[in-house]
């Protein structure tokens, strides 16, 4: 036993609050840690890291409870350092800079900024924590206009593997800032504060939601992939196709311009198949954000387990990958399955691949697919169905997104980080040479 004491809001197994503390957004990842430390400041994080090392206890850091695969932000029998109580935001309106503690969820952050007249590309799921999403890149329907979340990261405060509080920006620990802009959460330090560039929001924006009969998914997808990556970069759009039983096939997005202009831009999509609904409206900017991201309880808790996998589409999909998608959605055996797409390009693609750790700058679109279940007896079949799609899709996609990880990926360094993996390993060796911050698919230090 060491001399360091745990500080902050500490909950051991068996204490009041433990049952709530173990709940994550995805029940699939739930485990039973020894202790949770709900840090109130960087010193609590530092003490928890030192305590874990002194007591030889595995450790993880958690922000929004939104890790999508096992043992990433929680660990059985270990310590979970949860930063969700650290959720303050300081906005410098004159310089368009937001200093943000890493425990705040995306929803309250985006909506608070919108009310103050600013926008930022903070993702499309309001319960996700800013702590994790930033490190992996982070994107949403505004990213074609203003870049990835990580592209807007100017500085950070982190706690290293020895419990030292360090800062990184363009003039101090620049290599750590580079790695933190796409290198994945929890690898180099446990972050407690970010400084972001934010952008003046327009007074209004135009949003849309278009719904088609599920049976028209091939027609809709073919039209979407030929249109979405090349349309005006002020337009961000995702396409989501659910299981055949559910029957939903829809596109939703935002345009930083007028309704008249958007209707003109949407013509190729509106003329695909026979939409059953097309809701297009100009709203005050904060209301547009509410349209895209309705409020959800925080911390978020899904009522079903979910398995994800992800990839990038660099070429138009032929009939073969589209038929793989359709069969997956037709054969869904759990509670739900879906394919999600978002268009790429614009500001994202203007950043060189090696300027930050985020490598995937030039695909046409991003895609992820999921299967969900409530009954434990359905788990194996749903895990297998997601993996089968991953294998079948290999000829048609490239890479994978570290924020939507899949532990079936063996060559994860290349898949997540491309040619940037070697430099990330060198930076890991500098800031965490003993590999204290290790977890499934964490970056190993170079030797």
Curated annotation (Swiss-Prot):
One of its GO terms (biological process) is sporulation resulting in formation of a cellular spore. It holds the Pfam family FAD_binding_4. Its EC number is 1.21.-.-. This is Uncharacterized FAD-linked oxidoreductase YvdP. Belongs to the oxygen-dependent FAD-linked oxidoreductase family. It is found in: Spore coat. Keywords: FAD, Flavoprotein, Oxidoreductase, Sporulation. One of its GO terms (molecular function) is oxidoreductase activity. Its cofactor is FAD.
């Amino acid at each position: 036993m060491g001399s360091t004491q745990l500080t902050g809001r500490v909950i051991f197994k068996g204490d009041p609050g433990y049952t709530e503390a173990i709940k994550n957004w995805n029940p699939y990842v739930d485990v039973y840690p020894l202790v949770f430390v709900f840090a109130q400041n960087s010193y609590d994080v530092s003490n928890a890291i030192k305590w874990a090392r002194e007591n030889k206890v595995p450790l993880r850091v958690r922000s929004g409870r939104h890790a999508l695969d096992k043992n990433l932000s929680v660990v059985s029998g270990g310590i979970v350092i949860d930063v969700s109580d650290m959720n303050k935001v300081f906005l410098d309106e004159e310089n368009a800079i937001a200093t943000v503690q890493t425990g705040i969820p995306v929803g309250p952050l985006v909506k608070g900024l919108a009310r103050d007249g600013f926008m930022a590309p903070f993702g499309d799921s309001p319960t996700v924590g800013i702590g994790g999403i930033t490190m992996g890149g982070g994107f949403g329907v505004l990213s074609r206009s203003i870049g990835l979340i990580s592209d807007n990261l100017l500085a950070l405060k982190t706690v290293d593997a020895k419990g030292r509080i360090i800062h990184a920006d363009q003039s101090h620990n620049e290599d750590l800032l580079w790695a933190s802009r796409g290198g994945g959460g929890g690898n180099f330090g446990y972050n407690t504060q970010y400084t972001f560039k934010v952008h003046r929001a327009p007074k209004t924006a135009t949003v849309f939601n278009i719904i088609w009969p599920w049976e028209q998914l091939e027609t809709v997808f073919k039209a979407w992939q030929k249109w979405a990556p090349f349309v005006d970069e002020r337009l961000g759009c995702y396409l989501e196709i659910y299981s055949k039983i559910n029957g939903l096939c829809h596109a939703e997005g935002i345009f930083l311009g007028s309704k008249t202009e958007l209707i003109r831009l949407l013509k190729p999509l509106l003329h695909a198949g026979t939409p059953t609904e097309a809701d297009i409206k100009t709203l005050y900017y904060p209301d547009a954000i509410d349209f895209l991201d309705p409020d959800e309880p925080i911390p978020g808790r899904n009522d079903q387990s979910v398995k994800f996998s992800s990839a990038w589409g660099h070429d138009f999909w032929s009939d073969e990958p589209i038929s793989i998608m359709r069969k997956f959605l037709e054969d869904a055996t759990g509670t739900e399955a879906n394919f999600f797409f978002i268009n790429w390009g614009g500001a994202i693609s203007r950043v060189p691949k090696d300027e930050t750790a985020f490598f995937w700058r030039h695909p046409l679109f991003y895609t992820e697919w999921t299967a969900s279940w409530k009954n434990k007896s359905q788990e194996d079949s749903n895990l297998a169905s997601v993996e089968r799609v991953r294998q079948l899709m290999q000829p048609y996609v490239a890479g994978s997104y570290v924020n939507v990880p899949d532990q079936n990926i063996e060559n994860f360094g290349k898949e997540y980080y491309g040619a940037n993996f070697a430099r990330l390993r060198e930076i890991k060796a500098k800031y965490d040479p003993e590999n204290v911050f290790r977890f499934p698919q964490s970056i190993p230090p170079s030797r």
